[in-house]
Each structure stands twice: as structure tokens, then as C-alpha cells.
Amino acid sequence: MENSKIMKDIEVANLLEEVQEDELNEVLGAKKKSGVIPTVSHDCHMNTFQFMFTCCS
């Protein structure tokens, strides 16, 4: 069981090696002002929107 987990971790690490840093930043949203969405009144962090959409579920 432990060997299969190690092999899985190695496979994931190999996949990450194929991703360029610019591609990773684009996928993670790092190029977009670090998660801040500019609005008319102020900058809302993405966590604010996530809370609003998940607070009542």
C-alpha cells in the first residue's frame, strides 16, 4: 500500500515538471492581481465571493 502511494506521488511530480511556470501562474490565477477583483467601490477578495455563495448551503 505504501509503495503505491509513493508511485502515485512520483507520477504527480512528473506531471508538474511538464508545466511551465507561466502556465501554472495562468491556471492558478496568479497573473490577475493575486485574487483581487477590482470593483467600483473597492477591491473584493475572492474569499468574499466564495463566502457569499457558500454561506447558506
Swiss-Prot record:
Q: Which family does it belong to?
A: Belongs to the type A lantibiotic family.
Placement of covalent cross-link Lanthionine (Ser-Cys): 41-55
GO biological process terms held by the UniProt record? defense response to bacterium; killing of cells of another organism
The function of this protein is: Lanthionine-containing peptide antibiotic (lantibiotic) active on Gram-positive bacteria. The bactericidal activity of lantibiotics is based on depolarization of energized bacterial cytoplasmic membranes, initiated by the formation of aqueous transmembrane pores.
Q: Record keywords: Secreted included? A: yes
Q: What is this protein called?
A: Lantibiotic nukacin
From the UniProt record, list the residues forming the propeptide. 1-30
Temperature profile of activity? Retains 50% of its antimicrobial activity after heating at 100 degrees Celsius for 100 minutes, and retains 25% antimicrobial activity after heating at 121 Celsius for 15 minutes.
| 2,3-didehydrobutyrine modified-residue sites | 54
Instruction: Supply the alphabetized keyword list.
Output: Antibiotic, Antimicrobial, Bacteriocin, Lantibiotic, Secreted, Thioether bond
Record PTM text: Maturation of lantibiotics involves the enzymatic conversion of Thr, and Ser into dehydrated AA and the formation of thioether bonds with cysteine. This is followed by membrane translocation and cleavage of the modified precursor.
Main location group: secreted
InterPro entries assigned to the protein according to its UniProt record, in alphabetical order: Lantibiotic_typ-A_Lactobact (IPR007682)
NCBIfam families per UniProt? HEC_x9_TCC_lant
Recorded source organism is: Staphylococcus hominis
Coiled-coil stretches: none
A single Gene Ontology CC annotation of this entry is:
extracellular region
Q: Where in the cell is it found?
A: Secreted
- Crosslinked positions for Beta-methyllanthionine (Thr-Cys)? 39-44, 48-56
A single Pfam family it belongs to is L_biotic_typeA
Record GO terms (molecular function): signaling receptor binding
